Each structure stands twice: as C-alpha cells, then as structure tokens.
C-alpha cells in the first residue's frame, strides 16, 4: 500500500510539467515582447517606448494650401518624437501615458501633437490565445492653447461692386466719395476670407478616448484589431493673432489699414466646437525567434471638420458685424480629412529588458478643401527604443 502511494506521488510530480505544457506558449509571451500589438505589462512592471522619427510631406492643392502659396511644397525633415510609458497595476489592469512632439521648420509649426493618459483592462485572456481589451484615455489637448495667425483679406470685388452701386448717390451729392469708400470697405470686410497659419499642433481642447481591442495568438503569429472614438469638449483655449492683408482693396486702402483704423484687436480668442473622431486598425505580428520579430499594420483615422462657435473677444461696436460675419464663415471650417496608414517594423530583443525596433509608415489621405493636412505624399521612418523593468 505504501509503495502504491509513493508511485502515485511520483507520477503526479512527473505529470506536472506536462500540464504546464498544455498552456500555449503565446499566452505566456504577451507581456514579453513590447512590439506585440497585444502587449500588456505584468503586475508591477514598468515599460517605456521612445520613438524617434523623420517625416517627409508633399502638400496637396487644397484651397488652404493655395491661399498660402504652399500647394505642391515639400516639408522635410519633420521631426516626430513620441514617448509611451505604462505600468502594470495587475496582470489584467495597466495604466499608460503617451505624448508626441512634432517640429516642422518649413511651416514654422512646432509643439505637442498628441497626448493621452488612461487605463487598459484585459477582459479576456484565454488559453486558446484569444484576447479582448477595453480602454479609456483622457485626451490632453487642453494642456496648451491653440495658437496661430489668421491672415484676413477683404474682398476687393465686393468693395468695387459696392462703390459702383453708390456712384449715382455720389453724383447726386447725397454722399461724398470718402463716405462711399468707407461703406465699400466695410462691405468688403463682411465678405473677407482668410487662412490660419498654425503655430502649434494643439487643438486646445480636453476630451476622452474610449476603445476596444481584440486579438488572437497562433504560436508565433499574433493578429489584432481595434476601434476607438475620441470626443473633445469645445472651449476658447485659443490665441489667434489677426493680420490684415496689405494688398489694396481700393486704391490707397488695404485690409490692414482698414482694420487698424477701426480699432481691431491684434489677437482674439475663439470658442471651438466639440467634435467626434474615429480611429480603427488591424495589426499582424510575427515572432521569428526569441530575438527577432516583425510587425505590419493598417490604421484608419477620421478627423472631423473644425468649427468656431463664437469669437469670445470683445470688439468695437463698428466691428460687431465683421465679427459676426467671421463667426458665420468659420462655423464650419471644412478642414477635415481621412488618413489611411500602412506600416512595417522589425525589432531585435537585446536583453530581457531592452529592445530596439525600426519602423516605416506611408499615409494616403483624403482631405477637405480648406484642410492643411492633405498631402500628395507622406512617409515617415524612425527608430524605437523599448525598456521595461
């Protein structure tokens, strides 16, 4: 009897590794390779992913680019640096933070271009390799102001047409040429047009992202898909300089001169409308060896048209009609765009705690007429350095 018990105990001990071997290897590696799209840090593990990229863009022929005489222009190098870090609170719950900085010297635009802080929860992590995550992030666009310069020009055709209409009154002595000119100039400002030169990449608004990700692991192959929604909260966290054109509206009168004579402010704040945006994507990842891995992805981004709810800066009474006309004109800025991004990466695991990846992306886009984000070509390449401890 004692011999039988000993044999049973020995059999149990020998069988234990076999039971462990029935757990698929990928189930145990989702917290190992930081380039895996389903990566999540284990409990009490901190990770950092620092991406350093260079981008080249060729501007399309949108109305906004034409107004800036920038259509067809090449922007290079555009410096893009992104830091993503996270911490495993438990094996299923992780906190994460990311921030991106972009510098484009060709258009004198620089600053934080993305930022988010949030939590990811792993709802499912099955032994067959199926994974389901949900996450929610605070959108950090409200950290800084939206800054730029609105280059405004009165409509010369409107001024000339108004002056022509008033010519009989001038001939009849009902008004002077100077009075008629002032009316014509005022009418030209009501039909004014312009374009914003952005100083930075912030939209000046807080918001939140909510999203979900599902994936499956087959031995060395991982695939995943995600979809997320961003909702921003409109506010007037903006500072926009007003620059009148020096081109003549009427002989001897320019937009800059007319605005100065009317006491126009040098800068204004505007309350931008809340918007809803959508991102979605697919990822594939292959673990060739314990050291080498590659990834590929497709991502879709829908960026909504921006719009101004109202200009919150007080202006002189004679400028109220101009202010209202600008609010109406900019209520729908028609500057949205859709981006379709494909990317590839290759990574090498140097140690259990350090990894380096190279990556490249190409973007196709479909931009609205007043968008400054439309391109004929957009490509980015860079190096990402990953650590965990």
Regions found by a protein language model. Name each.
Residues 19-59, 127, 170, 354:
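Outer-membrane beta-barrel biogenesis signature
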Residues 52-60, 99-105, 123, 138-144, ...:
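Transmembrane beta-strands of outer-membrane beta-barrel pores
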Residues 30-32, 46, 79-83, 113-117, ...:
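Hydrophobic, lipid-facing positions within transmembrane beta-strands of outer-membrane proteins
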Residues 59-70, 236, 242-389:
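Outer membrane beta-barrel transmembrane domains
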Residues 101, 108-272:
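Outer-membrane pore/translocation modules
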Residues 87, 91, 121-123, 138, ...:
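Residue-level signature of outer-membrane beta-barrel architecture
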Residues 51-81, 149, 193-203, 369-371:
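Surface-exposed strand-loop-strand hairpins of Gram-negative outer-membrane beta-barrel proteins
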Residues 91-97, 126-132, 220-224, 290-294, ...:
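Repeated loop/turn-to-beta-strand initiation elements of outer-membrane beta-barrel proteins
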């Amino acid at each position: 009897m004692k011999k039988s018990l000993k044999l049973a105990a020995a059999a149990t001990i020998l069988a234990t590794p076999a039971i462990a071997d029935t757990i698929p290897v990928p189930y145990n590696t989702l917290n190992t390779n930081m380039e895996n799209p389903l990566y999540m840090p284990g409990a009490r593990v901190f990770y950092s992913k620092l991406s350093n990229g260079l981008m080249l863009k060729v501007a399309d022929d949108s109305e906004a680019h034409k107004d800036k005489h920038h259509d067809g222009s090449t922007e290079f190098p555009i410096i893009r640096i992104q830091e993503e870090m996270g911490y495993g609170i438990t094996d299923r719950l992780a906190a994460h933070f990311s921030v991106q900085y972009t510098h484009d010297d060709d258009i004198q635009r620089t600053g934080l271009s993305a930022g988010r802080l949030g939590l990811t929860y792993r709802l499912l992590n099955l032994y067959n390799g199926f994974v389901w995550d949900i996450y929610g992030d605070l959108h950090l666009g409200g950290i800084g102001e939206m800054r730029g310069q609105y280059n405004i020009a009165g409509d010369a055709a409107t001024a000339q047409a108004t002056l022509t209409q008033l010519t009989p009154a001038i001939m009849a002595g009902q008004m002077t040429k100077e009075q008629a000119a002032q009316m014509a100039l005022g009418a030209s400002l009501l039909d004014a047009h312009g374009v914003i030169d952005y100083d930075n990449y912030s939209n000046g608004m807080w918001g939140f992202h909510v999203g979900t990700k599902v994936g499956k692991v087959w031995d060395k192959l991982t695939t995943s898909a995600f979809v997320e929604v961003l909702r921003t909260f409109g506010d007037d966290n903006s500072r926009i300089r007003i620059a009148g054109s020096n081109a003549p509206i009427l002989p001897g009168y320019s937009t800059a001169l007319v605005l100065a004579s009317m006491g126009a402010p040098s800068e204004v704040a505007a309350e931008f409308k809340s918007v809803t945006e959508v991102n979605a994507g697919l990822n594939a990842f292959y673990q060739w060896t314990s050291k080498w891995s590659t990834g590929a992805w497709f991502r879709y981004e829908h960026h909504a048209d921006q719009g101004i709810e109202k200009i919150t800066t007080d202006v002189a009474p004679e400028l109220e009609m101009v202010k209202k006309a600008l609010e109406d004109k900019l209520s729908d800025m028609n500057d949205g765009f859709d981006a379709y991004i494909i990317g590839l990466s290759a990574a090498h695991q140097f140690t259990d705690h350090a990894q380096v990846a190279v990556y490249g992306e190409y973007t196709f886009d479909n931009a609205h007429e007043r968008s400054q984000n439309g391109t004929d070509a957009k490509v980015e390449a860079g190096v990402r350095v990953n650590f965990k401890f």
